[in-house]
């Protein structure tokens, strides 16, 4: 099994803003590519090309890569290609980078962190300002607690088996709780159905 991975598209936001995490995601990938390539694998679409840039020029450049693909992108050592199943890939790793597209938004928690937890992989999360209102701190590694990628990496590498297993036990307990069930797809379907029936 692998150490750490990430699954994402190589894309950027249309207009730069201070709360976006697309660029932070790329910074983390680049750090691993340079400093710890053997401990990180990157999956997804488009990473054979350089990281996407925001704005009109960035979109034009990205479209050009569709016609003139790069023979080797920035992530030559870490990029492992496209995937068929997130669950199968994540299940082969101890940790996964799962940054939301934006930080600081309350309640903005997408499937990224849950994909990791359901796969038995410990998420390294950055996103919702109030994530701890929904998910216990013992269930994920909060990227906000580290000043840079080096300190995050040192923490991951120093984690012993007991601590790792404790994370997994806490994740399993959380996923089996009522607190987690509000994020299940069945709950969304029930809510949508109830709204439709009320009309």
Residue ranges and their predicted role:
Residues 149-160, 189-193:
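Two-component system phosphotransfer/interaction surface
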Residues 1-141, 163, 177-199:
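Nucleotide-sugar donor-binding catalytic core of glycosyltransferases
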Residues 157-176:
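Conserved donor-nucleotide binding/catalytic region of nucleotide-linked donor-dependent transferases
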